[in-house]
Design a protein with these regions (language model features):
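N-terminal "arm"/small-domain region of PLP-dependent enzymes with the aminotransferase-like
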Residues: 1-39, 405
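Phosphate-binding glycine-rich loop
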Residues: 42-98, 112-115, 122-124, 191
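PLP-dependent aminotransferase class I/II
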Residues: 47-52, 56-62, 135, 139, ...
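PLP-dependent aminotransferase-like
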Residues: 81-171, 175-180, 187
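Structural detector of well-ordered beta-strand residues that form the stable sheet scaffold
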Residues: 100, 121, 176-177, 201, ...
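A short alpha/beta connector and helix-capping loop motif
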Residues: 131-138, 190-199, 417
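Conserved active-site segment immediately N-terminal to the catalytic lysine
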Residues: 178-212, 241-246
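Active-site PLP attachment segment
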Residues: 195-233, 256-261
Length: 427
């Protein structure tokens, strides 16, 4: 319980959850775009970003786009066309089709499915890495055997159980689309995330491990797919002497100015990962003895990028907390706390945390969509079904978890104060 009598000095400047960290070369590449008048969606910066993405991640082709969401949209369109054929103009490539999706993620992972007319089916989370549960995925294929597309995200920079998921997806003849927006630079068995699907995406949003203020990349080893994405992203203009269009296109290309920032950031990716790892380790050490644990990782098979440090409170140490659609209330209890209380305490010293991603199956927009847990249909819950021990893992992690300030410019002294505030919540 965080007592009102606790007096912790507020930070003069806010400690952010995860803000951009600039180094200097970024502005030089932006100036280069300005001074050479390449203030468009073509130019050297874009070419360099695509080259650097391929070189670092280990894929054959990269297409720089305006956002990770744009990249994922075109990946879903490609997957839909491959699985079900080219749709008529005005119809989505996934129209009327189910797509298996990570449940505990940001809605940008899922919305592109709907852009193409698909119906997301949410697959529950596992406790080992907080990612898609392979057991639940197999159960989903039993329930919906005709599904041909699966989109998997790696939460907070920690790769999921890639081999298990891929084996199930391949067994059922489906296509994997990998959302590596949060996990750029993370590896699974020595291989970079963003290479495991047929179509893959990364993000350069302002809070990511490296940034362009915006932007993303579509990644693949399929040259035809890369060319198709490049064409679609420039309004699907044909190679004709006039403006001719035979397919639906989009204005999704990355700006050469934004690309200048990304180009300047790329050489610092490993440095950023090392800084994020140090933050995670300091939290892990500093919170020892409290009834909490950090976000889990499979360090035998993966090297996360430690994008965000998170904690989850032990069940017996949770005070009473009730969340509505937009409001929350809790009861202070000695020796116990909850995510809401900790976030309020952190905010009181001018630091930013946030709740864990609210699972997609709990979101109002998707509350009628199918949801699959290890034991089957997660929506069909009678009292007997619940008493049988069916677990909604994503809901549990959301209820007990939170993201801690993870800005790589945060000083050790600032982090120590945040740790002391968290400790005070359990007094």
């Amino acid at each position: 319980m965080f007592k009102e009598s606790n007096k912790f000095e507020k930070f003069e400047s806010k400690v952010w959850l995860s803000s951009p960290t600039m180094h200097g070369p970024e502005i030089e590449y932006v100036k280069e775009a300005y001074e050479t008048n390449w203030m468009s969606t073509v130019g050297k910066n874009i070419n360099e970003v695509e080259r650097m993405a391929c070189e670092y991640i280990g894929c054959k082709y990269a297409v720089a786009l305006s956002a990770g969401t744009a990249s994922l949209h075109l990946a879903m369109k490609l997957a839909g066309i491959e699985a079900y054929g080219m749709p008529k103009v005005g119809h989505g490539a996934l129209e009327g089709k189910k797509v298996f999706c990570s449940d505990m993620t940001f809605d940008a992972t899922v919305n592109p499915v709907v852009y193409e007319g698909g119906e997301p089916v949410f697959i529950d989370t596992e406790y080992d890495t907080w990612n898609m549960d392979p057991v639940a995925l197999e159960k989903a294929f039993e329930i919906y055997p005709d599904t041909k597309v699966v989109v998997v995200a790696h939460l907070y920079g920690t790769p999921g159980k890639v081999d298990e998921l891929n084996a199930i997806i391949k067994k059922h003849g489906a296509i994997l689309v990998e959302d590596a927006a949060e996990s750029m630079g993370a590896t699974y068995k020595g291989v970079q995330t963003g290479t495991f699907g047929k179509y893959n995406t990364i993000s350069f949003n302002g809070n990511k491990i490296i940034t362009g203020s915006a932007g993303g990349c579509f990644l693949t080893d399929d040259e035809e797919a890369a060319n198709k994405v490049r064409k679609w992203s420039t309004q699907a203009r044909e190679n004709a002497a006039w403006y001719q269009h035979e397919e639906l296109g989009y204005n999704y290309r990355m700006s050469n100015v934004v690309a200048g920032v990304v180009r300047g950031q790329f050489p610092y990716l490993n440095e950023h990962i090392a800084q994020k790892k140090a933050i995670y380790e300091r939290y892990k050490e500093g919170l020892k003895g409290l009834p909490v644990s950090m976000n889990p990782m499979d360090l035998e098979n993966t090297q996360p990028n430690y994008w965000l440090s998170c904690l989850i409170i032990d069940k017996e140490a949770m005070c009473k907390q009730v969340r509505g659609e937009q409001d929350v209330c809790y009861v202070k209890e000695t020796g116990k706390s909850c995510p809401t209380e900790i976030l309020e305490a952190i905010a009181s010293i001018n630091a930013e945390g946030r709740p864990i991603w609210k699972p997609m199956h709990m979101q109002p927009i998707y509350r009628l969509n199918p949801f699959v847990v290890r034991d089957g249909n997660g929506r069909a819950r009678s009292n007997a079904y619940i008493s049988g021990g069916v677990a909604d893992v994503g809901m549990d992690i959301f209820t007990r978890g939170l993201c801690l300030p993870s800005d790589n410019k945060m000083t050790t002294a600032q982090q120590d104060r945040i740790i002391e505030v968290i400790k005070a919540c359990f007094e």
